[in-house]
Amino acid sequence: MTNGKLILLRHGQSEWNASNQFTGWVDVNLTEQGEAEAKRGGELLVEAGVLPGVVYTSLLRRAIRTANIALNAADRHWIPVIRDWRLNERHYGALQGLDKAATKEKYGDDQFMEWRRSYDTPPPELADDAEYSQANDPRYADLDVVPRTECLKDVVVRFVPYFEEEILPRAKKGETVLIAAHGNSLRALVKHLDGISDADIAELNIPTGIPLVYEIAEDGSVVNPGGTYLDPEAAAAGAAAVANQGNK
């Protein structure tokens, strides 16, 4: 049987990526650059001959639009798209909407990095009546509890079981699956796929708009640990830019 493929695609640059704000579950749109990144992501899929048969994405427009733009560029606009909240970005709690550089200056490097990159320390909770709360957002009406904050461990807990149950079986059958999601939901997935430790995951940065392809064997194992970026040079530069967020 031919190996299946998982295509991990972080959404293109969003408005708050550009303004260096913590975004989380706030539903901001793509910038023009983000749209171009999504289009280029789809073109890279065509150039590599890696064409998805199904897409999984979040309930946030920056990921949904990235998927749609990439699929149009790859002439795969007709394939099924499944949207689920468990692919959402990590909820950044009371940090949502704050400028990253200003937050780092106010709280110091150590606290900033603990909130941003530690595995199991969430930021302070966001009040239900706060400006950027999702407590009354109709798209989350079926959730027993809408998150008020999350650490990366929380994202692993919500996303990985869904991946194991809904997405991985497709890849094990030889399908090619596009996962259009977010920096931290994809970090959670890569941690799982590559067995990255809780400490080492802090060093992993996912660039926007560049497909990362994992080959999956029939038994569900990863054939190419670490995955393969379809534009390695751009991916390295993009990851470095993500790591630098918070600096003026």
Swiss-Prot record:
Domain of life: Bacteria
TM annotation in the entry: none
SUPFAM superfamilies: Phosphoglycerate mutase-like
EC main group: isomerase
InterPro entries cross-referenced by the UniProt entry: His_Pase_superF_clade-1, His_PPase_superfam, PG/BPGM_mutase_AS, Phosphogly_mut1
Catalysed transformations (reactions): (2R)-2-phosphoglycerate = (2R)-3-phosphoglycerate
SMART domains (alphabetical): PGAM (SM00855)
CDD domains, per the entry: HP_PGM_like
Keyword field: Gluconeogenesis, Glycolysis, Isomerase
Entry annotation: catalytic residues: 11, 89
Catalytic activity, EC: 5.4.2.11
Pathway listed: Carbohydrate degradation; glycolysis; pyruvate from D-glyceraldehyde 3-phosphate: step 3/5
Residues that, per the record, bind substrate: 10-17, 23-24, 62, 89-92, 100, 116-117, 183-184
HAMAP family: PGAM_GpmA
Function: Catalyzes the interconversion of 2-phosphoglycerate and 3-phosphoglycerate.
Family: Belongs to the phosphoglycerate mutase family. BPG-dependent PGAM subfamily.
Protein name: 2,3-bisphosphoglycerate-dependent phosphoglycerate mutase
